[in-house]
Amino acid sequence: MAKSTVYFTSELTPEAVVKMYRQLGIELPGKVAVKVHSGEDGNQNYLHPEFMKPVIDAVNGTVVECNTAYGGARNETPKHIELMKKHHWSDLFDIDIMDAEGPDVEWPVENGKVLKVNYLGKNIANYDSMLVLIHFKGHPMGGYGGALKQLSIGCASSAGKTYIHTGGKVTDQHILWENCAEQDTFLEAMADAASTVAKHFAGKIAYVAIMKNLSVDCDCCAVAEDPCMNDVGILSSLDPVALDRACIDLVMNSNDPGRDHFMERVNSRHGTHTIDTAEALGIGTQAYELVKV
C-alpha cells in the first residue's frame, strides 16, 4: 500500500481547522455528519464548540453524537440533550443524538477480529458523508483517543459501546462492567467497529485531529487530569490509521517534559494495538508522509 498523506500545522486557531480540512481537497457531499466529542459534564479539557464552528459551518454540517454506556450526563438522551445545551453545542449548531430513538442500525463487520456486527445510532443512515473532528488525547481505557476511537466508540450507540467494551458479549449498559473484555480484545473490537464506519463512508469521509489540551484522560472523564504536554498543532488526513499513527509519533518524538507521562498511559493500555488491528482490517496504513502546511 502506498504511503498516506497526513498534513500538519502548528497553528492552533479555529481558522486553521478549516485550512487543514481544505488541504485534503475533498468536498463532502450531501448531508454531512460532523462527529465531535461533546465533553462530559465537569471535564475541563474538551474542545469547545466555538473552536469548531468555522469548520462545521464550512461543510454545512450537523453535529452528531451518541449516548454513552456508563453513568454520567450523557448516557440517556434527555440528559445528553441538556449537556449539549450546557456546553453550547445547541446554541451554535443543529444537533443529532443519533441513537436518541431505536432501533439501532446493525452494520456487518467484514473479517472482524472480534465482532461480527456493529450497533450504531440509527440516524447515521441519514447522512451522505462525515467529517470526523478529533480531540487527540490520552484515554483511561483505550490508552489514547483519536480517529479510530471516534469512528468506533464515538459512532456506536449506547448498546454498541457496551458491545465493543465487552468484546461482543452483551449490549446492556447496566451489566457492562462485569462483562468487560480482556484489554486486547476490547482494542480489537474498537478497530472492528471503526472499520464499518470507515468503509460505509469510503471516499466521503475526512479526518481532522487537534492536538491541544493534551491530558492523559479523555473528554469522557468528569474528573480528568490537566494537560501534561504543551499543545502541538492540527493534523488532517483521509486515512484514520495514518492520522492516529502520526499523532502518536509526534508525541513520542517530542522533547516535551510531559511526553513520558502521556506515553505511559498509551503503552500501559497497549493503545497502539488498535492501530495495528485497524491496519490489518484494511482501512488504512501506518506508512505515511507528514506534510507541513
Residue ranges of each PLM-predicted region?
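Extended, low-polarity segments enriched in aliphatic/aromatic residues
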Residues: 2-53, 58, 62-293
